[in-house]
Amino acid sequence: MSEKIVMALVVAIFGLTTIVGCGTAKIPQVGDKAPAFTLQSIEGKNISLSDFQGKIVLIVFTSVNCKECETQMPYLVGAYENAGGKLVVLDIYHMIYDPRLVQDYVTSKQFTTFPSLPDLNNTVANSYGATRYPPTNFIIDATGTIKYKKIGPFQSQQEIEDIIKSF
């Protein structure tokens, strides 16, 4: 092979590697700091993760047409109520359509115990690497560190409470 061809291949591979590497965001894992975010609730209030520093935060990435998400809702409510103010639950809804769908859904299902946050363009979900189906659940400790991640619904209230007690 001529030197020119080898040099062209090296430059092409380097350029492609650089382009691909620049477009890849790091998906946070257990032990990482939770990505910061601010979203507007269906009531119009801006809610930031940093608002809850010092508390345990359970973030649920969900969707208006996710049946598995609905099945875990009573477990979330029970764990929240038993935590005595030490636990915050945030329902973040994947959105690619009109955010009023979230309001209509939450109202019809009476899921009003904790903030419902439409995630327009899935910006926050993408920063966490969250899936649309099944739900993706993150538990963040009082220092803002991801302590637990689960893809799929919780199977019981006790499951949630045991995880929270473990840290």
Segments from the language model and where they lie:
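Thiol/disulfide oxidoreductase modules built on the thioredoxin-like
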Residues: T107-T113, L120-I164
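Short, small/polar residue-rich loop motifs at catalytic or cofactor-binding pockets
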Residues: K33, K55, R132-P134
